[in-house]
């Protein structure tokens, strides 16, 4: 074994850095291993990417946002700069360019052995902060598309100039899909969107940014086990909204009014022909209903706590599909490019320890696993909605560090 550490943190993004900050506060020996460099996950986003939560909610431990636009939304390069400055502010024991290929029990002292691209390391504790974006989730039917159709996952999309002339189909209506539709529409592209079940929330409501209301009404404090969906919420897409140009609501019906062609889910493909599910109306109605239910809860909290707020001034968009087609002919529609906003698949196969459920997702209680010394931090809804966000990832990091 080349080296041994009390604690090894796997992953050097906002979660791993937050853990390192707390470890340094108590003088705990550790090292942070990252396969890339600080900010790489964000560095790979498209050119106009921005946060959808206001800058004031960037609250990494010891490094709250201190810029001039607390209610603005940092762009991609600003996010990278924020993380780089964070790392410089406390100088974590960070090793970039190191891939952890296997984590398992140790046979040579200590609890764990980590096989890395730079040799074997040992540790008494391991905190996994590597996220769940290991592999792009591309539908199986993509392999059946005609060879001259350009296909990109949102991970690989950068700007409209990447794509050939012609219309574009975006598959998936979560945050990435809808924001890429925004980007391409602004560039004058004719857009088609295959709508899924991801919800929406308005950018502003009753005089405040919606994120401020979610905080004020206690949503950020809601433990995952008290969410109506339970732990299944961990695998659902974030509701769509935008921070672009100062922030705005993304309403799929309004996109349609503005010229975006909406379609049901794509269920199969053959060359240039796509088979569509008969679910566009159902999904649009469900999205609207879920949004309305959320706003009713905010209204109730405003009334219950006697909060001074203006009345609801949201304008509803009265648009309905004229006819749901069972197919979409890409050639006939002039579509030469397909972009998948279909999220990612997690892959914890490199962890050779008995802590996973039937789908390969780790079992834990607020990041604490059944294996002594093994923890997870930074996962979506690990404990609350903020667990995977700049705002509250530090709380879970502290919780885990306090248990070491």
Region locations from a protein language model:
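Leloir-type glycosyltransferase catalytic cores
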Residues: 70-74
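Flavin (primarily FAD) cofactor-binding/catalytic cores of flavoenzymes
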Residues: 2-12, 18-40, 48, 75-404
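Short glycine/proline-rich turn/loop motifs
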Residues: 61-68, 377-383
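Redox-cofactor-proximal catalytic regions of oxidoreductases
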Residues: 37-64, 255
């Amino acid at each position: 074994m080349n080296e041994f550490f009390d604690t090894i943190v796997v992953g050097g993004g906002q979660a791993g850095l937050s853990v390192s900050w707390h470890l340094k506060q108590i003088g705990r020996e550790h090292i942070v291993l990252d396969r890339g460099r600080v900010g790489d996950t964000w560095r790979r986003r498209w050119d106009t990417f921005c946060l959808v939560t206001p800058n004031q909610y960037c609250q990494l431990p010891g490094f709250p946002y201190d810029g001039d636009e607390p209610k603005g939304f940092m762009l991609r390069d600003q996010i990278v700069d924020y993380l780089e400055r964070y790392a410089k502010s406390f100088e974590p024991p960070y090793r970039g360019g190191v891939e952890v290929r296997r984590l398992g029990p140790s046979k040579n002292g200590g609890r764990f052995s980590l096989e890395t691209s730079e040799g074997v390391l040992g540790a008494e504790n391991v905190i996994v902060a590597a996220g769940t974006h290991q592999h792009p989730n591309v539908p199986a039917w993509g392999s059946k598309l005609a060879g001259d159709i350009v296909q990109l996952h949102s991970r690989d999309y950068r700007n409209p100039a990447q794509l050939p002339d012609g219309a574009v189909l975006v598959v998936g209506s979560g945050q990435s899909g809808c924001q890429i539709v925004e980007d391409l529409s602004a560039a004058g592209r004719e857009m088609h969107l295959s709508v899924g079940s991801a919800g929406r929330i308005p950018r502003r409501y009753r005089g405040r940014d919606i994120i401020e209301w979610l905080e004020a009404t206690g949503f950020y404090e809601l433990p995952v086990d008290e969410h109506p969906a339970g732990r299944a919420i961990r695998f659902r897409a974030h509701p769509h909204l935008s921070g672009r140009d100062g922030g705005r609501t993304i309403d799929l019906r309004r996109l349609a009014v503005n010229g975006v062609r909406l379609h049901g889910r794509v269920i199969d493909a053959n060359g240039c022909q796509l088979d569509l599910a008969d679910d566009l109306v159902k999904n649009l109605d469900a999205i609207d209903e879920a949004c309305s239910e959320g706003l009713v809860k905010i209204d109730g909290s405003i009334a219950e706590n006697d909060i001074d707020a203006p009345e609801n001034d949201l304008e509803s968009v009265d648009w309905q599909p004229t006819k749901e087609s069972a197919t979409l002919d890409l050639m006939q529609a002039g579509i030469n490019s397909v972009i998948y906003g279909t999220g990612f698949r997690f892959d914890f196969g490199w962890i050779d320890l008995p802590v996973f459920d039937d789908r390969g997702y780790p079992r834990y209680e607020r990041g604490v696993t059944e294996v002594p010394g093994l923890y997870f931090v930074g996962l979506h809804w690990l404990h609350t909605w903020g667990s995977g966000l700049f705002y509250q990832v530090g709380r879970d990091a502290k919780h885990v560090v306090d248990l070491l």
